[in-house]
């Protein structure tokens, strides 16, 4: 399986360039008329935050009288967490899972208890994992079993660098857990067979979408639900979505990077930026961008968009992210075991 390409060779160089840009931008001086914040996020949130930044800027201008500019950075969630820990001057981190926020906390940049700063464990939107297939579903892909069949090319990112990829993997693991009644020998064999069909491990979810949609690789993309919807919206004649029989409740997490906002003197706007994600206006925008709002009233308004009956497991069913990371994605973990053989 080592023959497969693992994408992302240029990530480190790109990060150096970004860090240089942010080093100039991140030195906020107090200005009663203008403020700037840096949002370091994961791959498929680009379109949402481009729109959200506009409505937040309008809100902040009306409430405080300050104009606000938001600089965005996007990439694989695990990689982004590492870059922040290594000096990328994010004011807020909006990443794919709580483990990546914890990694920044462990680097001394985020205060303890961040998960309780905002409602719903500081997860203002959720998602799940689905399959994006080519129009007409020529390989008859309906559930996780079909991804292990001979001749099926699978595209999914690398769980070493991508938070979405870890959700993908754990959704497959949840299916295997149910199918094999918790027999880990059989579960590992199933996951190994699935990853044997993976053609390329891109560094992030957007790179995986590019491989599937723009480069025409593979028969099925394991994807964030919102990313799959965007692909169908933009290419309705080319793709369709398949919801597997079991998936996982994916909970992206948000946090203020406390040490950085102290340096930049912009804690008030950074905290408000995350708090406003829970407003009705932002929750509607979240749904329009195919994330699942945590406001249940607004979620139900969009029931025609989302499959609200899909069986969703949670990461807590597997002991939480600390245990999952250690068991599956740390060096020498289950993923290394099944992928490197």
Which residue ranges define each predicted feature?
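Early extracytoplasmic/lumenal segment of secretory-pathway proteins
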Residues: 7-8, 21-107, 117-118, 224
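A conserved helix-loop-strand patch within extracytoplasmic ligand-binding domains
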Residues: 105-178
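Alpha-to-beta junction loops
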Residues: 87-94, 151-153, 214-223
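Periplasmic-binding protein-like
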Residues: 123-128, 190-195, 201-203, 234-262, ...
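Extracellular/periplasmic juxtamembrane helices and adjacent flexible linkers that interface
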Residues: 2-14, 18-20, 261-341
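Solvent-exposed loop/turn segments at secondary-structure junctions
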Residues: 44-47, 77-80, 98-102, 136-139, ...
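Second-shell loop/turn segments in exported
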Residues: 35-39, 83, 90, 118, ...
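Ligand-binding pocket segment of bilobal, Venus flytrap-like solute-binding proteins
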Residues: 180-244
């Amino acid at each position: 399986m080592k023959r497969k390409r693992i994408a992302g060779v240029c990530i480190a160089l790109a990060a150096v360039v970004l860090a240089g840009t942010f080093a100039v931008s991140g030195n906020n001086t107090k200005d009663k008329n203008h403020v700037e914040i840096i949002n370091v996020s994961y791959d498929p949130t680009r379109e949402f935050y481009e729109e959200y930044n506009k409505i937040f800027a309008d809100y902040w201008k009306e409430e405080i009288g300050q104009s606000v500019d938001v600089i965005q950075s996007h990439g694989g969630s695990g990689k982004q967490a590492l870059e922040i820990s290594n000096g990328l001057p994010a004011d807020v981190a909006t990443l794919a899972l709580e483990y990546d926020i914890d990694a920044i906390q462990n680097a001394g940049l985020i205060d303890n208890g961040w998960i309780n700063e905002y409602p719903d464990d500081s997860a203002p939107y959720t998602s799940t994992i689905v399959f994006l297939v080519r129009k007409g579903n020529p390989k008859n892909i309906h559930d996780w079993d079909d991804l292990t069949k001979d001749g099926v090319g699978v595209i999914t990112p690398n769980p070493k660098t991508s938070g979405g990829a870890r959700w993908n993997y754990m959704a497959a693991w949840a299916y295997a857990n149910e199918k094999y009644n918790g027999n880990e020998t059989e579960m590992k064999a199933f996951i190994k067979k699935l990853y044997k069909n993976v053609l390329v491990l891109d560094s992030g979810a957007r790179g995986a979408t590019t491989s599937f949609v723009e480069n025409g690789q593979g028969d099925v993309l394991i994807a964030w639900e919102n990313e799959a919807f965007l692909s169908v919206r933009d290419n309705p004649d080319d793709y369709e979505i398949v919801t597997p029989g079991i998936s996982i409740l994916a909970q992206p997490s948000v946090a203020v990077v406390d040490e950085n906002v102290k340096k930049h003197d912009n804690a008030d706007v950074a905290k408000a930026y995350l708090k406003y994600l829970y407003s009705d206006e932002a929750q509607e925008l979240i749904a329009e961008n195919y994330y699942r709002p945590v406001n249940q009233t607004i979620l139900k308004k969009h029931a025609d968009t989302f499959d609200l009956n899909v069986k969703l497991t949670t990461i807590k069913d597997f002991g939480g992210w600390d245990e999952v990371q250690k068991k599956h994605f740390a060096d020498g973990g289950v993923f290394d075991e099944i992928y490197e053989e």
